[in-house]
C-alpha cells in the first residue's frame, strides 16, 4: 500500500503546485478532513462501507467541505479517493503529501522533544543547526517530555539525533555492559 499512498500524494502535490495553491493551506485543509475522519467513528464507517453508494459518500464529503471551506482541488482529490475506495488511506496519503511538498520545496520537517518548553531564541538556534546538518530550510514542531531529564531529541525524517541526558546515560550503560 505504500506505493499507492506515494502515488496519490505525488499526484496531489503535482496538482497543488501546478495550480499555484498556497501549500500551507492545502496541507491544512487536507489535514482538516483527516482529523474529521479520525475523530468520527461514524464517518470512518461510512468511508469504509462498500455498500454505501459513491454518490452518498460524495454528498457527505460536500457537506464536510462546505462546513470548513475546503478548496475545490482538495475536495476533488478526496472525491477521487472515494471513487477508488481509498479514503481509509487518507491519513497516510496526507502525511506523504506533506513530506513530498517539503521535499519539492527544499524543506525538512523536524520534531524536537525537550524536557521543557524552549524559548524562541533556543528554537531559532536549534533550527539553524538542523538546517546546517540537513542542508535545507527547517520546519520544526516542538514537544516536551519530562522523562528526558535534560537535553533534546531531534528527529528529521527517519534520522534521530539523541542529545538527551537519558539517551546519553543509556549509551554509557551500553558501553559499560559491552566492556
Swiss-Prot record:
Disulfide bonds: none annotated. It comes from the Bacteria. It is a peripheral membrane protein. Keywords: ATP synthesis, Cell inner membrane, Cell membrane, CF(1), Hydrogen ion transport, Ion transport, Membrane, Transport. One of its GO terms (molecular function) is proton-transporting ATP synthase activity, rotational mechanism. GO terms for cellular component: plasma membrane; proton-transporting ATP synthase complex. InterPro entries: ATP_synth_OSCP/delta_N_sf, ATPase_OSCP/dsu. It is found in: Cell inner membrane. Transmembrane segments: none annotated. F(1)F(0) ATP synthase produces ATP from ADP in the presence of a proton or sodium gradient. F-type ATPases consist of two structural domains, F(1) containing the extramembraneous catalytic core and F(0) containing the membrane proton channel, linked together by a central stalk and a peripheral stalk. During catalysis, ATP synthesis in the catalytic domain of F(1) is coupled via a rotary mechanism of the central stalk subunits to proton translocation. This protein is part of the stalk that links CF(0) to CF(1). It either transmits conformational changes from CF(0) to CF(1) or is implicated in proton conduction. HAMAP family: ATP_synth_delta_bact. NCBIfam families: ATP_synt_delta (TIGR01145). Belongs to the ATPase delta chain family. F-type ATPases have 2 components, F(1) - the catalytic core - and F(0) - the membrane proton channel. F(1) has five subunits: alpha(3), beta(3), gamma(1), delta(1), epsilon(1). F(0) has three main subunits: a(1), b(2) and c(10-14). The alpha and beta chains form an alternating ring which encloses part of the gamma chain. F(1) is attached to F(0) by a central stalk formed by the gamma and epsilon chains, while a peripheral stalk is formed by the delta and b chains. This is ATP synthase subunit delta. It comes from Koribacter versatilis (strain Ellin345). The gene is atpH.
